[in-house]
Amino acid sequence: MEKVESFELDHRKVKAPYIRKCCLLDGKCGDKVTKFDIRFLQPNKEEFGTAAMHGLEHLLAHELRAKLEGIIDLSPMGCRTGFYLSIWGDREASEIKEALEYSLEKVLEAKEIPAANDIQCGNYRDLSLFGAKEYAKEALERGFSLNIYGE
């Protein structure tokens, strides 16, 4: 059985916030998909509140698409310390960092959360614009490293 990539990462050694290129997947038809670990919070020490994380997910899913072509999905991590970004092509973490910083600045300017209704969202009552902005502000202040060990 194939190993789960994220379970192979020693979460005790990483230093958040960071952006990590997890893997490059090669499809049977020559297509490529890159997966990134966008870690906002320190594993096993911090975690997002669900409403803030859910709000940030909606906002980033919307804003990142203005800067990055080929986004497949932005998915919250079950541990609530960050997000996974899947995108078409062989992409680099530096490109993701630039787009993420732009998008987080846009989050700070947001007046509402996109798709915050019962038609477009399966849990629209659990969203926090205030919380999303607080995490965006903190992440921008701390800065995202491209070195997961913070060196």
From Swiss-Prot:
Fe cation binds at residues 54, 58, 121. Its cofactor is Fe cation. It catalyses: S-(5-deoxy-D-ribos-5-yl)-L-homocysteine = (S)-4,5-dihydroxypentane-2,3-dione + L-homocysteine. It is an enzyme of class 4 (lyase). Its EC number is 4.4.1.21. The keyword Ribonucleoprotein does not apply. Coiled coil: none annotated. Binds 1 Fe cation per subunit. Keywords: Autoinducer synthesis, Iron, Lyase, Metal-binding, Quorum sensing. GO terms for biological process: quorum sensing. InterPro entries: LuxS_sf, Metalloenz_LuxS/M16, S-ribosylhomocysteinase. Pfam families: LuxS. Homodimer. PANTHER family: S-RIBOSYLHOMOCYSTEINE LYASE. Belongs to the LuxS family. Involved in the synthesis of autoinducer 2 (AI-2) which is secreted by bacteria and is used to communicate both the cell density and the metabolic potential of the environment. The regulation of gene expression in response to changes in cell density is called quorum sensing. Catalyzes the transformation of S-ribosylhomocysteine (RHC) to homocysteine (HC) and 4,5-dihydroxy-2,3-pentadione (DPD). This is S-ribosylhomocysteine lyase. It comes from Clostridium botulinum (strain Alaska E43 / Type E3). The gene is luxS.
